[in-house]
């Protein structure tokens, strides 16, 4: 097996500004015009033809004739019976930790009096209906069911719909059962996103769609989120990525394993090592080659390593600065006192601190969510959490005294904006209150 290109050490300080910018560029994910047009056609057909279009696309893209789009309860029970106890116990432990972490994210009611007689509240309500897309293929992702289904249940979403390409893996069906998801449909690709966004005879329309997917799924989510008749989505999606910051005390084998755990996701994944220690970087390159030989998805990982980087910096501070500029989906701090620099980390989806916090823990069972912003969106987007399955509402209630105390402020600002109806809504009430007060005084 030929070695990868992931064995060339790059000295950051010796690179020009343009070269540094190029080093932090990600593999292109822009949908081609062909994909954009194809997805648009799929969306329109599903909206117009419903289940008929869904069956046609399943035959064309998944090479499966789907008679019943919805998976029955008996089919889910049969899938559960086929799974080993080890897998079931592992999923149960993962769900427990995910529940603990996401339950802790419940937002308290905000209830304050901003001035006498003016009461303001912030309350939350669950999104009524959500759709979860779970990719299929050679590597089913039941962990994503747990990461999406658990917060949806905790939030109290009344309807949770799950779509996955046929045939749906037993692990995915069991994970759905574990999360209390009863509406499961064997549809994949852009057509599944269309079904959840618009609804069909079998698939209910939802308000918001979650979950990862290929370029067609990603483009479908983008398009439905921009249509008035579509649905909201969780966040923009891109290929998986990890950045590791390592000092001279780091363990090369651990670093290599974490880098490869992301590289095996797909050929467009990207992994980066930043270290002030050239010896560590070189040792990691050797470890990567040795561990690659043991991986079932070695060919995929090798492709990902072609656009990955081993970067040697001047010092740890430079590593931090580069990481914040890149904004990785996963950030691993393989340094001696990671807690001393966490306050300097501004842009990352999820951070893993120390030798004993592998990225795999967050992917599966530590309790944090593995649905994270990628492609630099960490500068503006957060990791998925309970807040994504609820919406906030504000409430205000003014007493007569409260309105009188605030009236002149509102009237002045409304007049400044030349919105006289706004001003009048206050003035009429103030007049009514003053008239009532005058009448009482006369009595």
UniProtKB/Swiss-Prot annotation:
InterPro entries: Ald_DH/histidinol_DH (IPR016161), Histidinol_DH_CS (IPR001692), Histidinol_DH_monofunct (IPR022695), Hstdl_DH (IPR012131). Its cofactor is Zn(2+). The keyword Transport does not apply. Substrate binds at residues 240, 262, 265, 330, 363, 417, 422. NAD(+) binds at residues 133, 191, 214. Binds 1 zinc ion per subunit. GO terms for molecular function: histidinol dehydrogenase activity; NAD binding; zinc ion binding. The active site is at residues 329-330. Pfam families: Histidinol_dh (PF00815). GO terms for biological process: L-histidine biosynthetic process. Pathway: Amino-acid biosynthesis; L-histidine biosynthesis; L-histidine from 5-phospho-alpha-D-ribose 1-diphosphate: step 9/9. The keyword Coiled coil does not apply. Homodimer. Belongs to the histidinol dehydrogenase family. Catalyzes the sequential NAD-dependent oxidations of L-histidinol to L-histidinaldehyde and then to L-histidine. This is Histidinol dehydrogenase. It comes from Yersinia pestis.
């Amino acid at each position: 097996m030929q070695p990868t290109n992931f064995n060339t050490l790059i000295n950051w300080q010796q690179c020009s500004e343009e070269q540094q910018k190029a080093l932090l560029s990600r593999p292109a994910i822009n949908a081609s015009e062909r994909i954009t047009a194809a997805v648009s056609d799929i969306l329109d057909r599903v909206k117009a033809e419903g289940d008929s279009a869904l069956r046609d696309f399943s035959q064309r893209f998944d090479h499966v004739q789907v008679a019943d789009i919805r998976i029955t309860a008996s089919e889910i029970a049969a899938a559960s019976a086929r799974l080993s106890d080890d897998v079931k116990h592992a999923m149960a432990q993962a769900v427990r930790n995910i529940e603990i972490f996401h339950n802790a994210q419940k937002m308290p009611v905000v209830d304050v009096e901003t001035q006498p007689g003016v009461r303001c509240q912030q309350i939350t309500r669950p999104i009524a209906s959500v759709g979860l897309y779970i990719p299929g293929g050679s590597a089913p992702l039941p962990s994503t069911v747990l990461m999406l289904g658990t917060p949806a249940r905790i939030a109290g979403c009344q309807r949770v719909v799950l779509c996955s390409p046929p045939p749906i893996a037993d692990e995915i069906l069991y994970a759905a059962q574990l999360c209390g998801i009863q509406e499961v449909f064997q549809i994949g690709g852009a057509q599944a996103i269309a079904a959840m966004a618009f609804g069909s005879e079998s698939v209910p329309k939802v308000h918001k769609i979650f979950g990862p997917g290929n370029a067609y799924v990603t483009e479908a989510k983008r398009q439905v989120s921009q249509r008035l008749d579509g649905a909201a989505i969780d966040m923009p999606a891109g290929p998986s990525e990890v950045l590791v910051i390592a000092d001279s005390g780091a363990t090369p084998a651990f670093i290599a394993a974490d880098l490869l755990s992301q590289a095996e996701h797909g050929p467009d994944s990207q992994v980066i090592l930043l270290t002030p220690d050239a010896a560590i970087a070189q040792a990691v390159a050797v470890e990567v080659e040795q561990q690659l030989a043991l991986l079932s998805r070695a060919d995929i990982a090798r492709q990902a390593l072609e656009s990955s980087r081993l970067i040697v910096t001047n010092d740890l501070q430079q590593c931090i600065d580069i990481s914040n500029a890149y904004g990785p989906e996963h950030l691993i701090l393989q340094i001696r006192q990671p807690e001393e620099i966490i306050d300097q980390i501004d842009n990352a989806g999820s951070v893993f601190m120390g030798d004993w916090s592998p990225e795999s823990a967050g992917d599966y069972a530590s309790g944090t969510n593995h649905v994270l912003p990628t492609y630099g969106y960490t500068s503006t987007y957060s990791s998925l959490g309970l807040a994504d399955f609820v919406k906030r509402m504000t409430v205000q209630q003014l007493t007569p005294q409260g309105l009188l105390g605030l009236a002149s402020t509102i009237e002045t600002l409304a007049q400044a904006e030349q919105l006289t109806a706004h001003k009048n809504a206050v003035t009429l009430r103030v007049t009514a209150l003053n008239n009532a007060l005058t009448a009482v005084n006369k009595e």
